[in-house]
Amino acid sequence: MVGALFRTGQVLLVHRSPDRAAYPDVWDLPGGHREPGESELDALARELHEELKVRIVAGSTSHLCRLDAGRGPDRVRLSAWLVSDWRHEPTNAAPEEHDEIRWFPVAELPPLAHGLLGIALMDAIGTHLA
């Protein structure tokens, strides 16, 4: 589960620490895994609070896409959500996972940990805003 916090044409990305075992030293959307019994939105809300200390405002999410990334035992199914409203200013609350957070204009996103996610994100945001 990953979330694209979106405001005024920009998306918040997290830079994965160079010490991370999986996908080190790359930009990514914040998020993580679902716990047993959690819905996608519950997992998204929990992960964004744990990593950024934000609280998603009810009704402010739109599903962007699902895609498979990686191979073999590293394969994961990503579900990406657009979040357009939240409480509290995002802060790096997980410095052991991310060494930086930064807003990027949608048209200038850097390469993401999962390459297809960046393409899907730009397409989905364009469709969402149309």
Functional labels for PLM-detected ranges:
Residues 6, 24, 58, 73-78:
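Short connector loops at helix/strand junctions that flank enzyme active sites
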Residues 9, 65-90, 102, 124:
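Active-site-adjacent beta-strand/loop module that shapes the phosphate/pyrophosphate-binding cleft
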Residues 82, 91-125:
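NUDIX/MutT-family hydrolases
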Residues 3-4, 19, 72, 92-95:
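Short secondary-structure boundary/capping segments
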Residues 1-12:
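Conserved N-terminal beta-strand and adjoining loop/helix that marks the start
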Residues 10-50:
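Conserved Nudix-box catalytic region and its N-terminal flanking loop in Nudix hydrolases
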Residues 55-65:
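A short coil-to-beta-strand element that immediately follows conserved catalytic motifs
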